[in-house]
């Protein structure tokens, strides 16, 4: 139980009623201590480029619409999210995804409507752990997450992922250039 003595209350009231309390400028100096760092996350893989500001581009080679419609391996690309420099106190990493989700296929991210560089229609991209099926696509803008295993958190391993181009409406895909933005978010514990 905290006991408050009367003289402390008087001092507090004197401070609260002082004209200096109503000043328009307040400067605060403080010292913060960071107890644990997080991790540096990079994206690696064939056809992956980094612009130097941790913005990555993954290019999937040109293919026919039939490859996307038939969900062949040519319509997807593998990459890894690699964690390095993690604090020893980090026991897990969760990954979530944000992007412009398709209304008809909410697990697929589609191009922004104002992006004139993307000329496809009814095509989106989905993200999943490598070697899993399309039912495991990570739903953007949701609480769905992928929790990294202890092994995947090692700098020489990483979280192996696949991005796949798929029709948002079966049989309705229109070929062209595809460009969409996905943002991976990381939560550490």
From Swiss-Prot:
The name this protein carries in UniProt is Uncharacterized fimbrial-like protein YadM
Q: Name one GO biological process term.
A: cell adhesion
Per the record, the major location class is: other
Question: What does the record say about the knockout?
Answer: Deletion of the operon under classical laboratory conditions does not result in any major effect on E.coli capacity to form biofilms compared with the wild-type strain.
Q: Which organism is it from?
A: Escherichia coli (strain K12)
The extra comment attached to this record reads:
The operon is cryptic under classical laboratory conditions, but is functional when constitutively expressed.
A UniProt-annotated Pfam family:
Fimbrial
| Database matches in InterPro entries | Adhesion_dom_fimbrial (IPR000259), Adhesion_dom_fimbrial_sf (IPR036937), Adhesion_dom_sf (IPR008966), Bact_Fimbrial_Adh_Pro (IPR050263)
Residues in the signal sequence = 1-23
Which superkingdom, per the lineage?
Bacteria
Per the record, its GO cellular-component terms are:
pilus
Where composition is biased (Polar residues), the residues are: 113-123
Family recorded in the similarity comment:
Belongs to the fimbrial protein family.
Q: Where does it live in the cell?
A: Fimbrium
Question: Which of UniProt's keywords are assigned here?
Answer: Fimbrium, Signal
Q: Please report what switches on or represses expression of this protein.
A: Repressed by H-NS.
Q: What does this protein do?
A: Part of the yadCKLM-htrE-yadVN fimbrial operon. Could contribute to adhesion to various surfaces in specific environmental niches.
| Keyword Signal assigned | yes
């Amino acid at each position: 139980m905290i006991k408050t003595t009367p003289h402390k209350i008087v001092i507090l009231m004197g401070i609260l009623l002082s004209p200096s309390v109503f000043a328009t400028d307040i400067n605060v100096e403080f010292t913060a201590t960071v107890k644990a760092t997080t991790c540096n996350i990079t994206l690696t893989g064939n056809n992956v480029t980094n612009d130097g500001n941790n913005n990555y581009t993954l290019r999937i080679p040109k293919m026919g619409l039939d490859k996307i419609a038939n969900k062949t391996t040519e319509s997807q690309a593998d990459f890894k999210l690699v964690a390095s420099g993690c604090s020893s106190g980090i026991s897990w990493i969760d990954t979530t995804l944000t992007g412009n989700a398709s209304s008809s296929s909410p697990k697929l991210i589609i191009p922004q409507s104002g992006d004139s560089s993307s000329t496809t229609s009814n095509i989106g991209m989905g993200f999943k752990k490598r070697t899993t099926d399309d039912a495991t696509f990570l739903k953007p803008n949701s609480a769905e997450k992928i929790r990294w295993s202890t092994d995947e958190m090692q700098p020489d391993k990483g979280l192996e992922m696949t991005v796949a181009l798929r029709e948002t409406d079966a049989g309705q895909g229109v070929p062209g250039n595809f460009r969409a933005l996905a943002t991976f978010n990381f939560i550490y514990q």
